[in-house]
Design a protein with these regions (language model features):
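Short, conserved phosphate/pyrophosphate- and ester-handling motifs at nucleotide-, phospho-/glycolipid
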Residues: 19, 80, 214
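Residue-level signal for the nucleotide or nucleotide-sugar donor/cofactor binding architecture
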Residues: 7, 47, 151, 206, ...
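Long amphipathic alpha-helix in the N-terminal Rossmann-like dinucleotide-binding domain
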Residues: 50-60, 113-117
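A short helix-breaking turn/cap at a secondary-structure junction
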Residues: 187-242
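Short glycine/serine-rich loop/turn segments
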Residues: 72-208
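Immediate post-signal peptide segment of exported/extracytoplasmic ligand-binding proteins
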Residues: 59-76, 217, 242
Length: 242
């Protein structure tokens, strides 16, 4: 096993900052893991290793230029396939949207990019985030469910195919798969993270949240996502330092 996939987010940040590891090396380590386990787990709705490596090379070149970098520079993050992305399909787990993309990035994707993170691919979801189960298997026992609807987002963390991931919850779609897959899931208080650009199922109940291997890992990501957004009137100002 490549030791890189065992590093905490803090360790990855520090090693990138100190030029001890590159974003390409990090992404290659996760690609190796995906190549080994994805055929059995089916956690990804969309994954293009060439696109990921291209983004990683751009990230490394930007750092090498000496320009200021964001707090998550070069860190790959998986995103649930109900969150709009311009450069990847957003199929929402339904054949109705096969191969279709959103017309703009979701706010959370723009925040990831602004922080320097790399969107590595789209994770599998139950159909329209609440109907038929996804294709994903529980990484600990392929005969069991990973839980839904954020099935892939939990499974990629449990199987070490990504260091961090974005999920969503309307009923129990973060906390349930986190529990089933044995990872940490964070469903924030309503209004902390913008839902603009993600599939809507309930204006008053929809949340976007985060999966990771530890509370500390999740904290690094959540800190960059808690922002007031004029396009999501539910969002409120809240200092991420709290």
């Amino acid at each position: 096993m490549n030791e890189i996939i065992n590093f905490s987010v803090q360790e990855l940040i520090d090693k990138i900052s100190n030029s001890q590891v590159t974003s390409v090396e990090i992404c290659e380590a996760y690609i190796e893991r995906i190549n080994k386990f994805e055929k059995d787990i089916n956690a990804w709705a969309f994954f293009d290793k060439e696109l990921l490596l291209e983004k990683a090379k751009e990230s490394d070149a930007y750092k090498k230029s000496g320009k200021p970098t964001g707090p998550l520079h070069g860190i790959p993050v998986a995103v649930k396939d109900i969150v709009g992305t311009l450069d990847m399909p957003t199929e929402c787990g339904t054949p109705i949207r096969k191969g279709k993309s959103y017309s703009q990035n979701a706010e959370i994707v723009d925040l990831l990019t602004s922080s320097g993170a790399i969107v590595m691919g789209k994770t599998a979801t139950t159909e329209l985030a609440y109907l038929n189960p996804s294709k994903t298997k529980n990484p600990h026992d392929y005969s069991r469910t990973p839980g839904g609807s954020s099935s892939g987002s939990a499974a990629v963390i449990a199987s070490y195919m990504a260091p961090l991931s974005i999920g969503s919850q309307t009923g129990g779609s973060i906390i349930r798969p986190a529990s089933y897959c044995g990872v940490v899931g964070y469903k924030p208080s309503f209004g902390l993270i913008s839902r603009n650009g993600a599939l809507k199922t309930s204006e008053k109940l929809d949340h976007l949240g985060v999966f990771g291997k530890s509370v500390e890992d999740i904290a690094y990501l959540v800190k960059e996502l808690i922002k007031k957004d004029s396009h999501d009137p539910a969002t409120v100002y809240y200092s991420s330092s709290n």
